């Protein structure tokens, strides 16, 4: 299931690094004084600039500025507000405290969302350029068409086993059993092999069932609490796979692009390409290695950190996907 992360915010650090990297005059500004000594902005900057968090903060600031300049007109305020409202709805009354605990204001979080959406736009556009007939055919081989299913979700394995026995009994009314026992209100789902509306274990097991087939108990993990969750699935609608991949061309394209979005190497390459176009240069030796992963991914031959794009995209903006930090929301996009 797709997620938006309220990343462990580097907003305060971003402000600090920006403040500390100002002109020499400002660097001499006093932060604190004491008998016989002072602490200046420059003192503070020199103290914090070598930390991993500071490097991530500078990297995030670079990503935000570069992508805003190159793709700023591609993401509307309406899109950002929609994603923000979905996150707020997910968290409910605890949303403000979730933001505050990570050093965010509401506007900070909207900026995070915007930066991530700018990156997503760029990655999608680059991914579309690379799609060939060979790409479609490869995706088609693994593709399983959409099915419709009745789904029972339970928190207890013992309860799941008991419900399964009832569901597999002769003449059982699976729809009623699902309605009476499932956690939550929804019992009917439609999905294919590229869907994210159910855990991957459930999708895999369900898509291998025949029409009217009932699964065994499928164990998965709750994406927010990480506690075990148990599923029972019955397929109510299933069609044979068309022999012509072109029948699924639109859906295959969506799946290919989605896979690229989740490919950290591809994302790094797109970010690296944007940095190159912007002629980004690092002037402070303390931050000399922060672009290495993007240079390597974009084919410049540089070697460097294998840190995922979370530092750049999610910390600047998710992690989501997902990612991930302790605070997440299933704000679907």
From Swiss-Prot:
SUPFAM superfamilies: FKBP-like (SSF54534), Triger factor/SurA peptide-binding domain-like (SSF109998). Residues 144-237 form the PpiC domain. The keyword Lipoprotein applies. Residues 1-21 form the signal peptide. A lipid is attached at residue 22 (S-diacylglycerol cysteine). It is a lipid-anchor. Residues 296-333 are annotated as: Disordered. One of its GO terms (biological process) is protein folding. It comes from the Bacteria. A lipid is attached at residue 22 (N-palmitoyl cysteine). The keyword Isomerase applies. Its EC number is 5.2.1.8. GO terms for cellular component: plasma membrane. Belongs to the PrsA family. This is Foldase protein PrsA.
């Amino acid at each position: 299931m797709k997620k938006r992360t309220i990343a462990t915010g580097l907003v305060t650090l971003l402000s600090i690094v920006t403040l500390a990297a100002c002109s020499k005059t400002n660097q001499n500004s006093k932060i604190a004084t004491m008998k016989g000594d002072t602490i200046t902005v420059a003192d503070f900057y020199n103290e914090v600039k070598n930390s991993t968090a500071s490097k991530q903060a500078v990297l995030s600031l670079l990503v935000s500025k570069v992508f805003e300049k190159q793709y700023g007109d591609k993401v509307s305020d309406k899109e950002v507000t929609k994603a923000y409202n979905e996150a707020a709805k997910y968290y409910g009354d605890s949303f403000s405290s979730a933001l505050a605990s990570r050093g965010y204001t509401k506007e900070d979080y909207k900026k995070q969302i915007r930066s991530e959406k700018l990156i997503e736009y760029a990655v999608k556009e680059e991914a579309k350029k690379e799609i060939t007939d060979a790409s479609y055919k490869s995706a088609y081989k693994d593709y399983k068409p959409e099915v419709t299913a009745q789904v029972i979700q339970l928190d207890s394995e013992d309860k799941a086993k008991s419900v399964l026995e009832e569901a597999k009994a002769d003449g059982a009314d699976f729809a009623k059993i699902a309605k009476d026992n499932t956690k939550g209100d929804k019992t009917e789902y439609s999905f294919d092999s590229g869907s994210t509306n159910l855990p991957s274990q459930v999708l895999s097991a369900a898509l291998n069932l025949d029409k009217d087939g009932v699964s065994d108990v499928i164990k998965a993990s709750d994406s927010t609490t990480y506690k075990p969750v148990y599923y029972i699935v019955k397929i109510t609608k299933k069609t044979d796979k068309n022999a012509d991949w072109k029948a699924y061309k639109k859906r295959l394209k969506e799946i290919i692009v989605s896979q690229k979005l989740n490919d950290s190497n591809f994302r790094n390459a797109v970010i690296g390409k944007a940095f190159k176009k912007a002629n980004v240069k690092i002037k402070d030796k303390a931050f000399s290695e922060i672009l290495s992963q993007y240079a390597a991914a974009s084919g410049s031959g540089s070697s460097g950190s294998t840190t995922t794009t979370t530092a750049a995209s999610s910390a600047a903006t998710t992690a989501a996907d997902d990612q991930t930090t302790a605070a997440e929301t299933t704000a679907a996009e």
